[in-house]
Regions:
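Membrane-embedded hairpin module used as a gating/binding unit in multi-pass transport
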Residues: 144-221
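Short glycine-rich or small-residue beta-strand-to-loop segments that form or flank ligand, phosphate
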Residues: 2-13, 38-44, 216-217
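An acidic, phosphate/nucleotide-engaging active-site surface
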Residues: 48-115
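Glycine-rich phosphate/diphosphate-binding loops that line cofactor/substrate pockets in enzymes
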Residues: 1-4, 29-35, 164, 205-209, ...
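Histidine-anchored nucleotide/phosphate-binding helix
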Residues: 13-32, 224-232, 238
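Short, well-ordered beta-strand core segments
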Residues: 101-103, 209, 215, 238
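Conserved phosphate- and dinucleotide-binding cores of soluble alpha/beta proteins
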Residues: 83, 91-96, 101-170
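C-terminal catalytic subdomain
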Residues: 220-264
């Protein structure tokens, strides 16, 4: 058996390392070996991450010992169906190839999806550009409210996650120092509803007129990145040049020691 662990990117404050270690321990108990476990960064349309950022999310040991890949929204997708809103769902093929599909994220209020977390790791997280653009087109036709869990965009995301077979989701609730103060895990739809209710209660500011749900707890200052990091087999995997997952290391970056090229 094999397993993919989908994690959110560096723009989100989720402390993924301790959660990922717990997930890996459960996978080991289920008989999944290390060589059959890999990570995919749910970038959506965000820029690619490099090795130093992989380490900030997962820690040096996990990055050194497991495959870590950026999602690419331009190629290497599997079509799994259309949502009820007629959005074609195309998912990262490296995600679809795994027997077990697990994701880690954070639940915060979100302008378009009501709350982050839940199925948002799939759409937009590991979807194609076409899927994301069709889903995001609803922002021009539908009125949204932050903290509203019943939006067309979330409906699409949940349908997409159900179609592609997301098995398990872990969502963290963070305090103002980006520390975990609660965790919700299980079926992505059920856990997201519970996490969203908890987040709405704890992130809400009551004013004289009406309560307002804040978008997120304050994000702490990002740590200073190291000036350099060891070049290893994982460093080349952050390269954005399109190659199959099994041969993700970019030849020019690996052989010349050059810095991986920035995203287009």
């Amino acid at each position: 058996k094999s397993a993919v662990i989908i994690i959110d990117d560096i723009t989100r404050p989720t402390p993924c390392e301790p959660i990922a270690r717990a997930v890996i321990a459960e996978l080991h108990a289920a008989g999944v070996p290390d060589e059959n476990i890999w990570f995919i960064i749910a970038l959506g349309t965000h820029g690619v991450m490099y090795r130093t950022e992989f380490v900030r999310k997962l820690g040096e040991e996990l990055v050194e010992n497991y495959e870590v890949h950026n999602h690419n929204l331009f190629f290497n997708h599997v079509f799994v169906g259309n949502t009820s809103n007629n959005v074609p769902v195309e998912i990262n093929a490296d995600v679809m190839s795994a027997d077990y599909k697990i994701a880690i994220g954070t639940t915060m209020a979100h302008s378009y999806y009501g709350f982050s977390g839940g199925a948002k790791c799939i759409l937009p997280g590991v979807s194609s550009l076409r899927t994301i653009m069709r889903n995001h087109s609803f922002t021009t036709t539908t009125e949204f409210n932050m903290g509203n869990p019943h939006t067309l965009m979330r409906s699409d995301a949940e349908q997409a996650a159900r179609m592609m077979g997301l098995d398990f989701k872990v969502d963290a609730i963070l305090n103002g120092h980006a520390e975990i103060c609660n965790l919700f895990a299980g079926d992505f739809e059920a856990e997201e509803r519970q996490a969203a209710a908890y987040a709405a209660e704890h992130y809400r500011i009551v004013t004289s007129s009406s309560p307002t749900t804040t978008s997120s707890p304050p994000r702490p200052t990002a740590p200073i990145r190291p000036r350099s990091s060891p070049r290893s087999r994982t460093a080349a995997r952050s390269c954005s040049r399109p190659t199959p997952r099994s041969a993700r290391a970019c030849t020019s970056c690996t052989t010349s020691g050059a810095t991986p090229p920035p995203a287009a």
